[in-house]
Protein backbone atom coordinates (compact mmCIF):
# COMPACT_ATOMS: atom_id res chain seq x y z
CA UNK A 1 0.00 0.00 0.00
CA UNK A 2 1.46 3.37 -1.06
CA UNK A 3 0.77 6.51 0.92
CA UNK A 4 0.39 9.75 -1.07
CA UNK A 5 1.67 13.16 0.13
CA UNK A 6 -1.99 14.17 0.70
CA UNK A 7 -2.45 11.25 3.09
CA UNK A 8 0.79 12.13 4.90
CA UNK A 9 -0.50 15.68 5.39
CA UNK A 10 -3.77 14.26 6.76
CA UNK A 11 -1.75 12.26 9.32
CA UNK A 12 0.44 15.23 10.37
CA UNK A 13 -0.81 15.57 14.00
CA UNK A 14 -0.26 11.85 14.61
CA UNK A 15 3.19 11.89 12.95
CA UNK A 16 4.32 15.04 14.78
CA UNK A 17 3.31 13.72 18.22
CA UNK A 18 4.92 10.34 17.37
CA UNK A 19 8.14 12.11 16.36
CA UNK A 20 8.04 14.19 19.57
CA UNK A 21 7.81 10.94 21.59
CA UNK A 22 10.99 9.64 19.88
CA UNK A 23 12.84 12.97 20.32
CA UNK A 24 11.92 13.19 24.04
CA UNK A 25 13.01 9.55 24.55
CA UNK A 26 16.40 10.26 22.95
CA UNK A 27 16.73 13.51 24.88
CA UNK A 28 16.13 11.69 28.20
CA UNK A 29 18.67 9.01 27.22
CA UNK A 30 21.23 11.67 26.27
CA UNK A 31 20.81 13.99 29.23
CA UNK A 32 18.22 14.46 31.94
CA UNK A 33 17.04 18.06 31.82
CA UNK A 34 13.56 18.83 33.09
CA UNK A 35 13.19 22.20 31.33
CA UNK A 36 14.49 20.90 27.98
CA UNK A 37 12.16 17.88 27.89
CA UNK A 38 9.14 19.89 29.01
CA UNK A 39 9.89 22.46 26.27
CA UNK A 40 10.29 19.76 23.61
CA UNK A 41 6.96 18.19 24.62
CA UNK A 42 5.09 21.52 24.55
CA UNK A 43 6.68 22.48 21.20
CA UNK A 44 5.67 19.11 19.70
CA UNK A 45 2.07 19.44 20.89
CA UNK A 46 1.89 23.04 19.61
CA UNK A 47 3.27 21.96 16.23
CA UNK A 48 0.62 19.21 16.06
CA UNK A 49 -2.08 21.82 16.81
CA UNK A 50 -0.78 24.15 14.07
CA UNK A 51 -0.63 21.23 11.61
CA UNK A 52 -4.42 20.88 11.88
CA UNK A 53 -4.69 23.92 9.58
CA UNK A 54 -2.83 22.03 6.84
CA UNK A 55 -4.96 18.93 7.49
CA UNK A 56 -8.05 21.09 6.92
CA UNK A 57 -6.70 22.18 3.53
CA UNK A 58 -6.24 18.52 2.48
CA UNK A 59 -9.97 17.74 2.94
CA UNK A 60 -11.72 14.60 4.22
CA UNK A 61 -10.25 11.22 3.29
CA UNK A 62 -9.83 7.62 4.41
CA UNK A 63 -6.07 7.51 5.01
CA UNK A 64 -5.99 3.78 5.77
CA UNK A 65 -8.83 1.30 6.33
CA UNK A 66 -8.38 2.04 10.05
CA UNK A 67 -8.51 5.83 10.00
CA UNK A 68 -10.68 8.56 8.52
CA UNK A 69 -9.50 12.16 8.67
CA UNK A 70 -12.32 14.71 8.38
CA UNK A 71 -13.68 17.77 10.18
CA UNK A 72 -15.02 15.60 13.00
CA UNK A 73 -11.59 14.02 13.59
CA UNK A 74 -9.89 17.44 13.44
CA UNK A 75 -12.23 18.98 16.03
CA UNK A 76 -11.65 16.22 18.60
CA UNK A 77 -7.92 15.93 17.80
CA UNK A 78 -7.69 19.66 18.57
CA UNK A 79 -9.50 19.25 21.91
CA UNK A 80 -7.26 16.30 22.90
CA UNK A 81 -4.11 18.27 22.00
CA UNK A 82 -5.31 21.29 24.02
CA UNK A 83 -5.95 19.05 27.04
CA UNK A 84 -2.49 17.41 26.67
CA UNK A 85 -0.82 20.83 26.39
CA UNK A 86 -2.57 22.04 29.54
CA UNK A 87 -1.54 18.85 31.37
CA UNK A 88 2.15 19.40 30.49
CA UNK A 89 1.88 23.07 31.50
CA UNK A 90 0.33 22.28 34.90
CA UNK A 91 2.80 19.43 35.43
CA UNK A 92 5.95 21.59 35.10
CA UNK A 93 5.67 23.52 38.42
CA UNK A 94 4.21 20.42 40.11
CA UNK A 95 7.25 18.34 39.05
CA UNK A 96 9.77 21.03 40.06
CA UNK A 97 9.55 19.80 43.64
CA UNK A 98 9.52 16.11 42.68
CA UNK A 99 12.58 14.19 43.95
CA UNK A 100 12.67 11.34 41.43
CA UNK A 101 12.86 11.29 37.63
CA UNK A 102 10.68 14.06 36.25
CA UNK A 103 11.14 13.69 32.49
CA UNK A 104 9.22 10.44 31.93
CA UNK A 105 6.02 12.23 32.91
CA UNK A 106 6.00 14.17 29.63
CA UNK A 107 6.80 11.03 27.65
CA UNK A 108 3.77 9.24 29.11
CA UNK A 109 1.48 12.24 28.45
CA UNK A 110 2.67 12.36 24.81
CA UNK A 111 2.04 8.63 24.29
CA UNK A 112 -1.43 8.96 25.84
CA UNK A 113 -2.24 11.93 23.58
CA UNK A 114 -1.10 9.81 20.63
CA UNK A 115 -3.80 7.30 21.66
CA UNK A 116 -6.32 10.15 21.89
CA UNK A 117 -5.53 11.34 18.35
CA UNK A 118 -5.84 7.77 17.03
CA UNK A 119 -9.27 7.47 18.70
CA UNK A 120 -10.48 10.77 17.20
CA UNK A 121 -9.55 9.46 13.72
CA UNK A 122 -10.62 5.82 14.25
CA UNK A 123 -12.93 4.32 11.64
CA UNK A 124 -12.47 0.66 12.56
CA UNK A 125 -12.87 -1.43 15.71
CA UNK A 126 -9.17 -2.40 15.61
CA UNK A 127 -8.20 1.30 15.70
CA UNK A 128 -10.72 1.85 18.50
CA UNK A 129 -9.13 -0.89 20.63
CA UNK A 130 -5.56 0.22 19.83
CA UNK A 131 -6.36 3.83 20.67
CA UNK A 132 -8.02 2.93 23.97
CA UNK A 133 -5.03 0.80 25.01
CA UNK A 134 -2.58 3.50 23.91
CA UNK A 135 -4.37 6.09 26.04
CA UNK A 136 -4.86 3.74 29.05
CA UNK A 137 -1.43 2.13 29.46
CA UNK A 138 0.54 5.39 30.03
CA UNK A 139 -2.12 6.44 32.53
CA UNK A 140 -1.21 3.50 34.81
CA UNK A 141 2.21 5.10 35.28
CA UNK A 142 0.96 8.68 35.38
CA UNK A 143 -1.66 8.02 38.09
CA UNK A 144 0.98 6.35 40.28
CA UNK A 145 3.64 8.99 39.55
CA UNK A 146 3.61 10.32 43.12
CA UNK A 147 4.26 6.75 44.26
CA UNK A 148 5.65 7.82 47.64
CA UNK A 149 2.07 8.75 48.55
CA UNK A 150 -0.06 5.73 49.39
CA UNK A 151 -3.19 7.11 47.71
CA UNK A 152 -1.42 7.58 44.38
CA UNK A 153 -0.19 3.99 44.32
CA UNK A 154 -3.62 2.71 45.35
CA UNK A 155 -5.29 4.77 42.59
CA UNK A 156 -2.86 3.36 40.02
CA UNK A 157 -3.63 -0.25 40.99
CA UNK A 158 -7.39 0.43 40.99
CA UNK A 159 -7.23 2.06 37.55
CA UNK A 160 -5.15 -0.85 36.22
CA UNK A 161 -7.76 -3.38 37.42
CA UNK A 162 -10.62 -1.28 35.99
CA UNK A 163 -8.80 -0.89 32.68
CA UNK A 164 -8.03 -4.59 32.41
CA UNK A 165 -11.69 -5.47 33.05
CA UNK A 166 -12.85 -2.89 30.49
CA UNK A 167 -10.40 -4.08 27.83
CA UNK A 168 -11.40 -7.72 28.25
CA UNK A 169 -15.12 -6.90 27.89
CA UNK A 170 -14.41 -4.64 24.92
CA UNK A 171 -12.25 -7.20 23.13
CA UNK A 172 -14.77 -9.99 23.70
CA UNK A 173 -17.56 -7.75 22.39
CA UNK A 174 -15.53 -6.92 19.26
CA UNK A 175 -14.84 -10.64 18.71
CA UNK A 176 -18.58 -11.46 18.92
CA UNK A 177 -19.43 -8.64 16.47
CA UNK A 178 -16.79 -9.95 14.07
CA UNK A 179 -18.03 -13.53 14.41
CA UNK A 180 -21.55 -12.47 13.41
CA UNK A 181 -20.91 -9.76 10.79
CA UNK A 182 -17.44 -10.65 9.44
CA UNK A 183 -16.46 -6.96 9.54
CA UNK A 184 -14.65 -4.61 11.87
CA UNK A 185 -14.95 -1.39 9.85
CA UNK A 186 -17.57 1.08 11.16
CA UNK A 187 -19.09 1.57 7.68
CA UNK A 188 -19.31 -2.18 6.95
CA UNK A 189 -20.74 -2.76 10.44
CA UNK A 190 -23.35 -0.11 9.70
CA UNK A 191 -24.40 -2.00 6.57
CA UNK A 192 -24.55 -5.30 8.48
CA UNK A 193 -26.65 -3.75 11.23
CA UNK A 194 -28.85 -2.09 8.62
CA UNK A 195 -29.77 -5.50 7.17
CA UNK A 196 -32.03 -6.30 10.14
CA UNK A 197 -29.22 -8.23 11.82
CA UNK A 198 -29.64 -6.18 14.98
CA UNK A 199 -31.94 -8.85 16.48
CA UNK A 200 -29.29 -11.59 16.21
CA UNK A 201 -28.45 -12.77 19.77
CA UNK A 202 -24.69 -12.89 19.07
CA UNK A 203 -24.68 -9.33 17.74
CA UNK A 204 -26.68 -8.03 20.71
CA UNK A 205 -24.34 -9.86 23.11
CA UNK A 206 -21.33 -8.30 21.36
CA UNK A 207 -22.86 -4.82 21.55
CA UNK A 208 -23.70 -5.39 25.22
CA UNK A 209 -20.09 -6.39 25.98
CA UNK A 210 -18.81 -3.31 24.13
CA UNK A 211 -21.19 -1.02 26.03
CA UNK A 212 -19.88 -2.51 29.32
CA UNK A 213 -16.23 -2.01 28.22
CA UNK A 214 -16.80 1.56 27.04
CA UNK A 215 -18.94 2.26 30.14
CA UNK A 216 -15.90 1.42 32.31
CA UNK A 217 -13.69 3.71 30.21
CA UNK A 218 -16.17 6.60 30.37
CA UNK A 219 -16.93 5.94 34.09
CA UNK A 220 -20.67 5.62 33.55
CA UNK A 221 -22.90 4.18 36.29
CA UNK A 222 -22.80 1.25 37.19
CA UNK A 223 -19.22 0.90 35.85
CA UNK A 224 -17.85 3.92 37.73
CA UNK A 225 -16.71 1.89 40.78
CA UNK A 226 -13.34 3.42 41.67
CA UNK A 227 -13.43 6.56 39.51
CA UNK A 228 -13.50 9.09 42.42
CA UNK A 229 -10.69 7.18 44.20
CA UNK A 230 -8.57 7.40 41.04
CA UNK A 231 -9.22 11.15 40.70
CA UNK A 232 -8.35 11.69 44.37
CA UNK A 233 -5.16 9.61 44.32
CA UNK A 234 -3.77 10.79 40.97
CA UNK A 235 -1.51 13.87 40.90
CA UNK A 236 -3.55 17.01 40.05
CA UNK A 237 -2.14 17.41 36.48
CA UNK A 238 -2.95 13.74 35.76
CA UNK A 239 -6.52 14.18 37.04
CA UNK A 240 -6.77 17.02 34.49
CA UNK A 241 -5.79 14.66 31.67
CA UNK A 242 -8.10 11.91 32.94
CA UNK A 243 -11.10 14.22 33.16
CA UNK A 244 -10.56 15.87 29.77
CA UNK A 245 -8.40 14.24 27.08
CA UNK A 246 -9.20 10.62 27.85
CA UNK A 247 -12.98 11.20 28.15
CA UNK A 248 -13.17 13.41 25.02
CA UNK A 249 -11.19 10.97 22.86
CA UNK A 250 -13.20 7.91 23.90
CA UNK A 251 -16.54 9.72 23.59
CA UNK A 252 -15.65 10.96 20.09
CA UNK A 253 -14.96 7.43 18.83
CA UNK A 254 -18.17 6.11 20.42
CA UNK A 255 -20.08 8.87 18.64
CA UNK A 256 -18.52 8.01 15.28
CA UNK A 257 -19.39 4.34 15.80
CA UNK A 258 -23.02 5.27 16.56
CA UNK A 259 -23.13 7.55 13.50
CA UNK A 260 -22.06 4.85 11.07
CA UNK A 261 -23.64 1.85 12.76
CA UNK A 262 -27.29 2.62 13.63
CA UNK A 263 -27.02 0.94 17.03
CA UNK A 264 -29.63 3.32 18.46
CA UNK A 265 -32.27 1.83 16.13
CA UNK A 266 -32.57 -1.18 18.44
CA UNK A 267 -35.13 -0.50 21.17
CA UNK A 268 -33.26 -2.78 23.61
CA UNK A 269 -29.98 -0.87 23.13
CA UNK A 270 -31.76 2.50 23.47
CA UNK A 271 -33.37 1.43 26.76
CA UNK A 272 -30.04 0.15 28.16
CA UNK A 273 -28.26 3.39 27.18
CA UNK A 274 -31.14 5.45 28.57
CA UNK A 275 -30.98 3.69 31.95
CA UNK A 276 -27.17 4.15 32.07
CA UNK A 277 -27.53 7.87 31.23
CA UNK A 278 -30.30 8.39 33.82
CA UNK A 279 -28.37 6.55 36.55
CA UNK A 280 -25.12 8.43 35.75
CA UNK A 281 -26.81 11.84 35.94
CA UNK A 282 -28.70 11.22 39.18
CA UNK A 283 -26.08 9.10 40.99
CA UNK A 284 -23.11 11.29 39.97
CA UNK A 285 -24.80 14.43 41.29
CA UNK A 286 -26.17 12.84 44.49
CA UNK A 287 -22.77 11.38 45.44
CA UNK A 288 -21.01 14.71 44.81
CA UNK A 289 -23.28 16.40 47.38
CA UNK A 290 -21.49 14.92 50.39
CA UNK A 291 -17.88 15.31 49.18
CA UNK A 292 -15.40 17.46 51.09
CA UNK A 293 -12.54 16.60 48.72
CA UNK A 294 -12.57 18.74 45.59
CA UNK A 295 -10.95 16.10 43.34
CA UNK A 296 -13.50 13.47 44.42
CA UNK A 297 -16.25 16.03 43.88
CA UNK A 298 -15.01 16.72 40.33
CA UNK A 299 -14.71 12.95 39.79
CA UNK A 300 -18.38 12.42 40.62
CA UNK A 301 -19.33 15.50 38.61
CA UNK A 302 -17.52 14.04 35.56
CA UNK A 303 -19.78 10.96 35.86
CA UNK A 304 -22.87 13.20 35.65
CA UNK A 305 -21.43 15.22 32.73
CA UNK A 306 -20.91 12.02 30.75
CA UNK A 307 -24.53 11.16 31.61
CA UNK A 308 -25.67 14.45 30.04
CA UNK A 309 -23.63 13.66 26.93
CA UNK A 310 -25.24 10.22 26.70
CA UNK A 311 -28.61 11.98 26.20
CA UNK A 312 -27.23 13.59 23.02
CA UNK A 313 -25.73 10.24 21.97
CA UNK A 314 -29.09 8.45 22.29
CA UNK A 315 -30.72 11.21 20.20
CA UNK A 316 -28.02 10.91 17.51
CA UNK A 317 -30.38 9.29 14.97
CA UNK A 318 -32.61 12.40 15.09
CA UNK A 319 -30.34 14.67 13.07
CA UNK A 320 -27.11 16.65 13.17
CA UNK A 321 -28.12 18.82 16.14
CA UNK A 322 -26.98 16.05 18.49
CA UNK A 323 -23.47 16.17 17.02
CA UNK A 324 -23.45 19.94 17.41
CA UNK A 325 -24.62 19.58 21.03
CA UNK A 326 -21.82 17.11 21.84
CA UNK A 327 -19.16 19.32 20.20
CA UNK A 328 -20.23 22.45 22.09
CA UNK A 329 -20.75 20.58 25.38
CA UNK A 330 -17.33 18.90 25.23
CA UNK A 331 -15.61 22.23 24.44
CA UNK A 332 -17.33 23.80 27.46
CA UNK A 333 -16.50 20.82 29.65
CA UNK A 334 -12.86 20.91 28.50
CA UNK A 335 -12.25 24.58 29.35
CA UNK A 336 -14.22 24.41 32.64
CA UNK A 337 -12.33 21.29 33.79
CA UNK A 338 -8.95 22.73 32.74
CA UNK A 339 -9.65 25.81 34.84
CA UNK A 340 -10.89 23.89 37.90
CA UNK A 341 -8.10 21.29 37.90
CA UNK A 342 -5.60 24.02 36.97
CA UNK A 343 -6.38 25.88 40.20
CA UNK A 344 -5.93 22.63 42.18
CA UNK A 345 -2.58 22.06 40.37
CA UNK A 346 -1.38 25.59 41.16
CA UNK A 347 -2.16 25.01 44.85
CA UNK A 348 -0.45 21.59 44.95
CA UNK A 349 3.07 20.22 44.88
CA UNK A 350 4.40 16.71 45.66
CA UNK A 351 6.77 17.73 48.44
CA UNK A 352 3.98 19.27 50.54
CA UNK A 353 2.23 15.94 50.96
CA UNK A 354 -0.99 15.12 49.09
CA UNK A 355 -2.52 17.64 46.67
CA UNK A 356 -4.48 20.63 47.96
CA UNK A 357 -7.73 18.81 47.38
CA UNK A 358 -9.56 19.37 50.66
CA UNK A 359 -12.32 22.00 50.43
CA UNK A 360 -10.91 23.52 53.62
CA UNK A 361 -7.69 24.41 51.71
CA UNK A 362 -9.75 26.81 49.57
CA UNK A 363 -11.63 28.49 52.40
CA UNK A 364 -11.08 32.26 52.27
CA UNK A 365 -8.82 32.02 49.21
CA UNK A 366 -10.39 35.25 47.89
CA UNK A 367 -8.81 37.37 50.64
CA UNK A 368 -5.24 36.66 49.53
CA UNK A 369 -5.62 35.37 45.92
CA UNK A 370 -8.67 37.27 44.55
CA UNK A 371 -8.07 36.59 40.81
CA UNK A 372 -7.52 32.86 41.38
CA UNK A 373 -10.78 32.75 43.38
CA UNK A 374 -12.61 34.56 40.57
CA UNK A 375 -11.31 31.97 38.08
CA UNK A 376 -12.42 29.08 40.30
CA UNK A 377 -15.86 30.71 40.72
CA UNK A 378 -16.29 31.08 36.94
CA UNK A 379 -15.36 27.40 36.45
CA UNK A 380 -17.80 26.22 39.10
CA UNK A 381 -20.62 28.33 37.60
CA UNK A 382 -19.81 26.97 34.13
CA UNK A 383 -19.83 23.34 35.33
CA UNK A 384 -23.16 24.07 37.06
CA UNK A 385 -24.54 25.45 33.78
CA UNK A 386 -25.27 29.02 34.91
CA UNK A 387 -26.16 31.50 32.08
CA UNK A 388 -23.35 33.71 30.68
CA UNK A 389 -20.93 30.75 30.83
CA UNK A 390 -20.05 28.20 28.16
CA UNK A 391 -21.38 25.40 30.40
CA UNK A 392 -24.88 26.88 30.07
CA UNK A 393 -24.73 26.83 26.25
CA UNK A 394 -23.75 23.13 26.33
CA UNK A 395 -26.53 22.25 28.82
CA UNK A 396 -29.06 24.20 26.76
CA UNK A 397 -28.06 22.27 23.63
CA UNK A 398 -28.43 18.92 25.41
CA UNK A 399 -31.88 19.90 26.71
CA UNK A 400 -32.94 21.06 23.23
CA UNK A 401 -31.76 17.77 21.70
CA UNK A 402 -33.57 15.74 24.38
CA UNK A 403 -36.83 17.64 23.79
CA UNK A 404 -36.47 17.37 19.99
CA UNK A 405 -35.98 13.59 20.23
CA UNK A 406 -38.86 13.20 22.71
CA UNK A 407 -36.60 11.78 25.45
CA UNK A 408 -38.77 13.27 28.19
CA UNK A 409 -37.59 11.23 31.18
CA UNK A 410 -33.93 11.84 30.28
CA UNK A 411 -34.60 15.57 29.80
CA UNK A 412 -36.22 15.60 33.26
CA UNK A 413 -33.11 13.84 34.64
CA UNK A 414 -30.88 16.56 33.10
CA UNK A 415 -32.98 19.29 34.78
CA UNK A 416 -33.04 17.50 38.17
CA UNK A 417 -29.30 16.69 37.93
CA UNK A 418 -28.48 20.32 37.12
CA UNK A 419 -30.52 21.50 40.12
CA UNK A 420 -28.66 19.11 42.46
CA UNK A 421 -25.32 20.08 40.86
CA UNK A 422 -25.99 23.74 41.57
CA UNK A 423 -25.78 23.08 45.32
CA UNK A 424 -22.35 21.45 45.44
CA UNK A 425 -20.73 23.72 42.82
CA UNK A 426 -21.94 26.80 44.69
CA UNK A 427 -20.70 25.26 47.95
CA UNK A 428 -17.17 25.28 46.51
CA UNK A 429 -17.61 28.84 45.17
CA UNK A 430 -19.02 30.19 48.46
CA UNK A 431 -16.21 28.65 50.57
CA UNK A 432 -13.70 30.77 48.60
CA UNK A 433 -15.26 33.95 50.04
CA UNK A 434 -15.66 32.89 53.69
CA UNK A 435 -13.29 34.26 56.33
CA UNK A 436 -9.86 32.68 55.92
CA UNK A 437 -8.58 30.26 58.62
CA UNK A 438 -5.94 31.61 61.03
CA UNK A 439 -3.21 29.41 59.62
CA UNK A 440 -2.97 28.89 55.86
CA UNK A 441 -1.97 25.30 55.18
CA UNK A 442 -2.02 25.72 51.37
CA UNK A 443 -1.54 28.63 49.02
CA UNK A 444 -0.73 29.32 45.37
CA UNK A 445 2.59 31.06 44.54
CA UNK A 446 2.44 34.88 44.80
CA UNK A 447 3.14 35.41 41.09
CA UNK A 448 0.98 32.48 39.89
CA UNK A 449 -0.60 34.53 37.08
CA UNK A 450 2.80 34.97 35.40
CA UNK A 451 3.51 31.23 35.28
CA UNK A 452 2.55 29.16 32.23
CA UNK A 453 -0.04 27.23 34.29
CA UNK A 454 -1.55 30.49 35.53
CA UNK A 455 -1.85 31.82 31.96
CA UNK A 456 -3.62 28.60 30.84
CA UNK A 457 -6.08 28.92 33.75
CA UNK A 458 -6.78 32.60 32.93
CA UNK A 459 -7.25 31.86 29.20
CA UNK A 460 -9.66 29.01 30.08
CA UNK A 461 -11.69 31.36 32.29
CA UNK A 462 -11.80 34.03 29.56
CA UNK A 463 -12.89 31.52 26.91
CA UNK A 464 -15.63 30.16 29.20
CA UNK A 465 -16.98 33.71 29.66
CA UNK A 466 -16.51 34.94 26.06
CA UNK A 467 -18.13 31.87 24.47
CA UNK A 468 -20.80 31.91 27.19
CA UNK A 469 -21.83 35.44 26.16
CA UNK A 470 -21.15 35.09 22.42
CA UNK A 471 -21.03 31.38 21.47
CA UNK A 472 -21.46 31.85 17.69
CA UNK A 473 -17.74 31.41 16.73
CA UNK A 474 -17.58 28.10 18.63
CA UNK A 475 -20.93 26.90 17.20
CA UNK A 476 -19.73 27.79 13.66
CA UNK A 477 -16.50 25.86 14.25
CA UNK A 478 -18.42 22.79 15.47
CA UNK A 479 -20.84 23.03 12.51
CA UNK A 480 -17.91 23.15 10.06
CA UNK A 481 -16.63 19.93 11.59
CA UNK A 482 -19.88 18.12 10.80
CA UNK A 483 -20.56 18.17 7.03
CA UNK A 484 -17.27 16.42 6.24
CA UNK A 485 -18.51 13.15 7.76
From Swiss-Prot:
Main location class: membrane
InterPro entries recorded: NADH-Q_OxRdtase_suN/2 (IPR010096), ND/Mrp_TM (IPR001750)
Entry GO CC: plasma membrane
Annotated GO MF terms: NADH dehydrogenase (ubiquinone) activity; NADH:ubiquinone reductase (non-electrogenic) activity; quinone binding
Cellular localisation: Cell inner membrane
Any GO BP: ATP synthesis coupled electron transport
Keyword set includes Transport: yes
Recorded topology in the membrane: Multi-pass membrane protein
Residues spanning the membrane: 8-28, 35-55, 71-91, 104-124, 125-145, 159-179, 203-223, 235-255, 271-291, 297-317, 326-346, 374-394, 408-430, 455-475
E.C. code: 7.1.1.-
Family note: Belongs to the complex I subunit 2 family.
Subunit: NDH-1 is composed of 13 different subunits. Subunits NuoA, H, J, K, L, M, N constitute the membrane sector of the complex.
PANTHER family: NADH DEHYDROGENASE
Protein function: NDH-1 shuttles electrons from NADH, via FMN and iron-sulfur (Fe-S) centers, to quinones in the respiratory chain. The immediate electron acceptor for the enzyme in this species is believed to be ubiquinone. Couples the redox reaction to proton translocation (for every two electrons transferred, four hydrogen ions are translocated across the cytoplasmic membrane), and thus conserves the redox energy in a proton gradient.
Annotated protein name in UniProt: NADH-quinone oxidoreductase subunit N
Species of the source: Enterobacter sp. (strain 638)
Source lineage: Bacteria, Pseudomonadati, Pseudomonadota, Gammaproteobacteria, Enterobacterales
Gene name of the record: nuoN
